[in-house]
Amino acid sequence: MMMMSLNSKQAFSMPHAGSLHVEPKYSALHSASPGSSAPAAPSASSPSSSSNAGSGGGGGGGGGGGGGGRSSSSSSSGSGGGGGGGSEAMRRACLPTPPSNIFGGLDESLLARAEALAAVDIVSQSKSHHHHPPHHSPFKPDATYHTMNTIPCTSAASSSSVPISHPSALAGTHHHHHHHHHHHHQPHQALEGELLEHLSPGLALGAMAGPDGTVVSTPAHAPHMATMNPMHQAALSMAHAHGLPSHMGCMSDVDADPRDLEAFAERFKQRRIKLGVTQADVGSALANLKIPGVGSLSQSTICRFESLTLSHNNMIALKPILQAWLEEAEKSHREKLTKPELFNGAEKKRKRTSIAAPEKRSLEAYFAIQPRPSSEKIAAIAEKLDLKKNVVRVWFCNQRQKQKRMKYSAGI
């Protein structure tokens, strides 16, 4: 008997009555005589020979027209609507009882395809990550299959759209998966403008600082990238974009810790005060570091950094720059201490000379004898009193001016 496929959308066609082959389950239909009305046969066989029979003569005529009982609807005839009733009976005979779950086969196909896709992804991922050290975190399968629901396919058996993976998409799903992430995680290079603000955590999700300070793009599914702090990676990209040295770019994860930022800000403030440099001097001195893209900063920016009122991203971005300036300032300060004649020649201030009382009484005695001693006499007095020649000369000069003032005051 011809069965209509569940997955087919072809219209049902009524086969010719003479081409049907009689099966044993309808043998009761052919046991009745063609001329009888067969009132008891339908209850024992199937709905195909139900109460569509008309009069006795009409039933006989229908049986004779069927070729001697070769039609399963021998009793289905009548006056005007016998032909239509026979077609409806044949349709019910050909259609089996529908199962309770018409999507049973579809569910099995969905499960089989999902398992095949999972096997392909896991094998390919294990091959692509075999070079990673064993201390990395294990691969998480639940992050692999999120593209399964992005390939909707319409089932041929129903008009509803079921989110399954079409067989033609199985070969390209894995490529699409990596292709999508390859474009999504490209490191941005738009950090050459403003230093502050607009530091997004996603700028460096696919980048890491290499040994020479360059940014190296890594696969999006590398397990160690999932464990890194996004703020730390943003600082890495910032350090590379502004041309900082490689040792400044290779920051540790603890740099993103607010407690470490607070400790650095306090240490920076104390060192700045000890060096005798103002916040405005720090901001203007940053331009002398010759860092590409970093010019002078305002005094308020340095103040906000020291008071921890900047945003977390800006604190991370500004920390390596201020740290580089602090290292340069302390280096210059140490050089000034070791070689003061090179740096403090113009700024050196002469200390006030203080003469003790015994030396002062001796000088007054010499002044009473000779207010204007010669250069040789001044050198002898300086050697005797263990004073510098210039100090003795200046003292005699000042003492003469003092005597003039006293005489002028006495004359008035």
Swiss-Prot record:
CDD domains: homeodomain. GO terms for cellular component: cytoplasm; euchromatin; nuclear speck; nucleus; transcription regulator complex. Transmembrane segments: none annotated. SMART domains: HOX, POU. It is found in: Nucleus; Nucleus speckle; Cytoplasm. SUPFAM superfamilies: Homeodomain-like, lambda repressor-like DNA-binding domains. GO terms for biological process: axon extension; axon guidance; axonogenesis; cellular response to cytokine stimulus; cellular response to estradiol stimulus; cellular response to insulin stimulus; cellular response to oxygen levels; dorsal root ganglion development. Its main location: nucleus. Residues 241-412 are annotated as: Required for DNA-binding and transcriptional repression. PROSITE patterns: HOMEOBOX_1 (PS00027), HOMEOBOX_2 (PS50071), POU_1 (PS00035), POU_2 (PS00465), POU_3 (PS51179). GO terms for molecular function: chromatin binding; DNA-binding transcription activator activity, RNA polymerase II-specific; DNA-binding transcription factor activity, RNA polymerase II-specific; DNA-binding transcription repressor activity, RNA polymerase II-specific; p53 binding; promoter-specific chromatin binding; RNA polymerase II cis-regulatory region sequence-specific DNA binding; RNA polymerase II transcription regulatory region sequence-specific DNA binding. It holds the Pfam family Pou. A motif (Nuclear speckle targeting signal) lies at residues 174-188. Signal peptide: none annotated. A motif (POU-IV box) lies at residues 113-122. Residues 348-407 bind DNA. Residues 54-70, 78-87 have a biased composition (Gly residues). Coiled coil: none annotated. Residues 31-53, 152-169 have a biased composition (Low complexity). Residues 253-330 form the POU-specific domain. Belongs to the POU transcription factor family. Class-4 subfamily. This is POU domain, class 4, transcription factor 2. It comes from Rattus norvegicus. The lineage of its organism: Eukaryota, Metazoa, Chordata, Craniata, Vertebrata.
